[in-house]
């Protein structure tokens, strides 16, 4: 390359070389190109976000080169994955040849592993690393509870999260067939700051978490599941369910309600809930009783400890409402 450090110029040079040497058209695959813009949005760096996504920013310029290459025939197609609709909205005015496939029924199952795929995956791992299918039912139920449950259209089939299922099976294989102690991929946990940024206030954050972890869902308008929307809408209080959906945090339960898809996401959101509501989860509250339970199997003391030490920190009105529901 004669111009280094400028992605747009480098791509132009590569395409010019392909044309000059009569090479086949180029296929471009771009994954999570908006990862850095998501970080800018959730870190309150709106001015820099505007700078990199609008006018003649490097991001828009890069996609203009792709558009030109497709028009000239040096690029056969460009396929982008892992892109938030808010970034698509800021880019597609200049890259107006894009067709958004996210919610198309023929492509939905690309977003995770189907049950048939996960079944084959698990059986392969069991055969290779344990030598038998004896524990299939046990492990299958474990992965369904923790990694399944993602639905990307109201009537679509449930899918496994491919990333966290692979995390588990990799650990399972390394442990020679032993279930890993840590069931949650730490990459899923993000700083509580992003939640406050999305909801814009502590009270809004608490209300949203109450709906998700206590009432078991957020109501949404199915018409809002558009393939792109602007930044202002992304942070609108009435739009939280859809914003969370596109961030991969919630899933569609039906045409009216979104919910947390599995125990993994529920555990993560419960941690958020505890932090925002200052609920103490320290070991001294629970560990002594847990230790005694492993020796004496005193289930009554275990339950009593849970009610006194954990639920005892919740406001009485919240417990009453939850029990009544």
Locations of regions flagged by a protein language model:
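Conserved small/polar residues in nucleotide/adenosyl-binding loops
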Residues: 320-325
């Amino acid at each position: 390359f004669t111009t280094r450090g400028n992605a747009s110029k480098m791509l132009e040079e590569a395409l010019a070389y392909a044309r000059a040497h009569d090479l086949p058209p180029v296929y471009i695959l771009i994954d999570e190109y908006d990862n850095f813009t998501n970080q800018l949005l959730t870190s309150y760096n709106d001015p820099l976000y505007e700078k990199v996504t609008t006018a003649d920013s490097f991001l828009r310029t890069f996609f203009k080169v792709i558009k030109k290459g497709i028009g000239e025939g040096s690029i056969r197609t460009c396929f982008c994955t892992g892109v938030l609709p808010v970034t698509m909205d800021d880019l597609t005015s200049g890259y107006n040849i894009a067709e958004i496939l996210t919610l198309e029924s023929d492509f939905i199952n690309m977003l995770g592993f189907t049950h048939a795929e996960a079944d084959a995956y698990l059986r392969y791992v069991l055969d290779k690393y344990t030598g038998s299918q004896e524990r299939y039912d046990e492990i299958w139920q474990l992965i369904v509870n923790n990694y399944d449950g993602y639905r990307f259209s109201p009537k679509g089939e449930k899918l496994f999260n491919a990333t966290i299922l692979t995390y588990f099976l990799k650990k399972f294989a390394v442990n020679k067939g032993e279930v890993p102690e840590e069931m949650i991929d730490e990459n899923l946990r993000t700083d509580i700051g992003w939640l406050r940024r999305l909801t814009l206030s502590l009270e809004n954050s608490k209300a949203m978490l109450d709906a998700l972890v206590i009432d078991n869902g957020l109501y949404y308008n199915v018409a809002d599941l558009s393939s792109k929307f602007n930044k202002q809408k992304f942070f609108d209080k009435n739009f939280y369910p859809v914003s969370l959906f596109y961030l991969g945090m919630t899933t569609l339960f039906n045409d009216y309600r979104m919910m947390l898809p599995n125990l993994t996401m529920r555990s993560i959101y419960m941690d958020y809930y505890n932090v925002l509501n200052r609920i103490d989860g320290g070991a001294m509250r629970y560990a002594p009783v847990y230790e005694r339970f492993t020796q004496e199997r005193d289930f009554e003391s275990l339950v009593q400890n849970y009610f006194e030490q954990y639920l005892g920190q919740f406001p009485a009105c919240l417990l009453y409402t939850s029990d009544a529901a």
